[in-house]
């Protein structure tokens, strides 16, 4: 994508927004646990993509590149001073309408995923919600594939425990 004109860059951005806007908003919300912060993150992600289009060399897939920008942006926002001012408890009712279905099981899953530790949540989000492969997640997060596999297993186990506990409560 090097040496692209402003027109080509804007056209390419429109394509990327169309392809990734909804899944990225969903991921950002589950990552940041705040709708306003997720929307801000989404804008920041697409701004970074626009500014850095000419740096994409095809060494990884486009999706991996976009997700790496998204994860890094969410990580930065999550660790900024602003994140301390927001309520970090997520309920499915707080989710942006286009990001979650209203099925009770879906609501329980969203709440459970949001309740995971960040390092487990991010691999679950990238694997199940963004459909990245283990090697793509490893590249996106800058960790080994075995670390990704371990976090996926721990995340699944934790989700299973959380969801089974909720079934018993009802």
Task: Describe the predicted segments one by one.
Residues 1-26, 30, 97-98, 110-114, ...:
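N-terminal module of bacterial RNA polymerase sigma factors
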Residues 6, 44-61, 81-82:
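Sigma70-family region 2
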Residues 26, 40-47, 60-72:
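Structural recognition of an alpha-helix C-terminal capping motif at a helix-to-coil junction
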Residues 36, 135, 146-149:
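Residues within helix-turn-helix
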Residues 55-57, 68-88, 154:
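Arg/Lys-rich amphipathic alpha helix in sigma70-family domain 2
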Residues 71, 75, 141-165:
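DNA-recognition helix of helix-turn-helix
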Residues 76, 83-114, 133-135, 168:
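Internal acidic/polar
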Residues 123-127:
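A short pre-motif secondary-structure segment
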């Amino acid at each position: 994508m090097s040496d692209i004109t402003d027109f080509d860059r804007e056209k390419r951005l429109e394509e990327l927004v169309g392809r990734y806007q909804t899944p990225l908003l969903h991921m950002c919300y589950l990552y940041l646990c705040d709708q306003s912060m997720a929307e801000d993150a989404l804008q920041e992600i697409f701004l970074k993509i626009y500014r850095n289009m000419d740096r994409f060399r095809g060494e990884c897939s486009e999706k991996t590149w976009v997700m790496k920008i998204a994860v890094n942006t969410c990580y930065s926002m999550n660790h900024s001073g602003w994140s301390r001012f927001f309520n970090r408890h997520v309920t499915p009712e707080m989710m942006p309408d286009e990001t979650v279905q209203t099925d009770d099981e879906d609501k329980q899953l969203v709440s459970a995923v949001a309740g995971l530790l960040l390092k487990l949540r991010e691999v679950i989000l990238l694997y199940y919600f963004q459909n990245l492969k283990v090697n793509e997640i490893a590249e996106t997060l800058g960790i080994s594939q075995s670390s990704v596999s371990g976090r996926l297993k721990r995340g699944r186990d934790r989700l299973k425990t959380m969801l089974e506990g909720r079934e018993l409560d009802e």
